[in-house]
Amino acid sequence: MKNAARLTALLLAIAAGPTFAKQVRIPITRIKDVPVKCADEPLGTCHNRWHPGIKAVMDADLGDLVTFETRDAFDNPFNRATTPADVAAPNLNLIHPLTGPLHVNGAHRGDVLAVTMIDVQPGPDHFGYTVAVPGFGFLRDVFTEPAIVHWELDPLAKNGKTRYATSKDLPGVHVPLHGFAGTIGVELGLPEIEAAFLREDQLRRVEGFVLPPEPTDAVPAALCGPHGPARDRCLRTIPPRENGGNTDVKQMVQGTTLLFPCFIDGCGLSIGDVHWAQGDGEVSGTAIEMNAIVTVKVEVRKNLAAKYGNWPRLESNRSGVLRELEPDDFVATMGIPVKPAGVVMQPERWFHSDAQLTPLTNQSEDVTLAARDALLKMINLLTEPSTSPAPKPLTRVQAYLLCSVACDLRISNVVDVPNYVVSDFLHLDVFEKSADGNEDGDD
């Protein structure tokens, strides 16, 4: 984002108001610029489960500016020396380490917590990564081997220019900073915890892909660990829910306001899993992941949670906030719900038998299959020498990981039966240009 520093200063000035709001900081402990593990945090400012019994670590008043220091989504296991083999079996019990909860004074159950994003900066190590983990991601049946892209993150904007992430693993690619919190939310109340547990457990029992409560490596261990009183109801942070959480909505950038229903007094705001940038869909399961420093303003809209449907919302009155996320140049593929005969996708098994599905090459009204088709076509486009807009054609795994940070899956229609359309838009401005205006590497 151009002039990001100026925008941050403007947002800070607006947020502070004429009387200057108090500024609050929730710190974490770092060793040589890298955060210590969530479970080892001596300040007690980290947790990796949702439960209203998790105690607030800081208080803030309405209108305060609050800075959260955060870990990355996997609790910082990867670094510049990490190999693909090191990515093969990460500990998913550690996901996501969150900073908080923050108790907002004057906020009560039934209110709406308004959280305005003021600033998102990478942590002091200026390192990010994108990974493909076996068994996880949208195309986990196609990409079965581990992979990693290591990113160097521009520490400062120079002369108002755009800040980029670059990688030796993707030569000729630079991804601009559009930072946001992939996971941001409030604590659920006990009734909401029980409702979420029951519906997810019901889904798990019919072979849905669900991660149930897991006390191993849960933080705080005293509440959620193997001997904790809430070990069977401390919910995992991977699925988004009524409280927000791991929504991975890339539009939650500077100048937007997130609206969360408060399910407990004080709301219990937590932030983590921050991204330098992400494509709509986050198809590999990761964006450009980083530890970060996030500043927000907290306000309350009294007694509006029920009117807002007890569900999160996102809004902005800052002109051009979405336009800044759109590419100047793009190429897009279009997908419909088609597949090779013999391939059966797991979600369809809930509605049809394998005998019905196996011979089909077309399925009806299936947005997921259409998205898969569009993504596979984009990967083919990026890897085919005659069509690839990249400086050099990418390998298939390079293309998959690039799509996770720079391609936007968009639903184009859900009416033209049987073939709904999903389009996949690639931001061509992620490819560096040479002095003659061509992509680097062009003849």
Model regions and ranges:
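Short, Lys/Arg- and Gly-enriched loop/turn segments at beta-strand edges
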Residues: 73-85, 120-131, 266-276, 412-415
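Sec/Tat signal peptide C-region and signal peptidase I cleavage site
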Residues: 17-21
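Short, structured beta-strand/loop micro-motifs enriched in basic residues and often containing a Trp
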Residues: 41-51, 91-99, 235-243
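N-terminal, Lys/Arg-enriched amphipathic/low-complexity engagement segments
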Residues: 23-90
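Intrinsically disordered, low-complexity linker/loop segments enriched in Gly/Pro
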Residues: 119-253, 259
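Conserved mixed alpha/beta catalytic, RNA-binding, or beta-rich assembly cores of soluble enzyme
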Residues: 205, 211-364
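A generic structural signal for residues embedded in beta-strands
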Residues: 68, 112-115, 260
